[in-house]
Regions:
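An interfacial alpha-helical scaffold signature
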Residues: 1-132
Length: 135
C-alpha cells in the first residue's frame, strides 16, 4: 500500500514516512534514546536530499512572503513544516499556500531568524519541536 502512496508523492517527500514512524515511536516512548533516534532519522533524510512542506502566509504591505508559524502554549513561535500533504491537511484550518523546501536549507534558514525558537514538524499530529540547539 505504501508503494501506491509513493507513486503519487513528490520525490523529495518519499521516505519522510520514516520520520513520521520515528516521531510516533518517540511519542510512545519519550526517552533520550528515542529522541536521538528520531533526530538521526531526520538527519538521514536531510543527507538524502529530502524535503519538507512549508506553508506560506500571504504577503502584507511589504509584499514579502512569510513562512507559516505556530505559537505554542508557552508563547514561543516556531516555523511550521510538514513531512507530507496529509500531515499539512490535518490542521483543519483554511487551505494554505505551500511549497517544498530542502530540509538542509530549512534548518540553515531557521538559524538566521532570531524571532523563532526553531521548527515544529507536523504540528497537528506526529509532532516534534526541533529547537535551535538541535538544528
Amino acid at each position: 500500500m505504501s508503494d501506491n502512496k509513493n507513486v503519487n508523492q513528490d520525490k523529495g517527500l518519499q521516505g519522510n514516512e520514516k520520520i513520521e514512524q520515528a516521531i510516533a515511536a518517540l511519542q510512545q516512548e519519550a526517552t533520550q534514546e528515542m529522541l536521538a533516534h528520531t533526530l538521526t532519522v531526520i538527519r538521514r533524510r536531510m543527507r538524502e536530499k529530502g524535503q519538507f512542506i512549508l506553508s506560506v502566509e500571504p504577503p502584507t504591505g511589504d509584499n514579502q512572503l512569510r513562512i507559516g508559524t505556530v505559537k505554542t502554549g508557552d508563547g514561543k513561535i516556531w516555523w511550521a513544516a510538514f513531512t507530507g500533504f496529509e500531515e499539512e491537511l490535518k490542521g483543519g484550518g483554511s487551505v494554505q499556500s505551500t511549497f517544498l523546501t530542502d530540509i538542509d536549507q530549512l534548518f540553515h534558514s531557521a538559524l538566521q531568524v532570531n524571532e523563532i525558537e526553531g521548527i515544529i514538524l507536523n504540528p497537528w499530529n506526529r509532532t516534534i519541536k526541533i529547537g535551535r540547539a538541535h538544528v
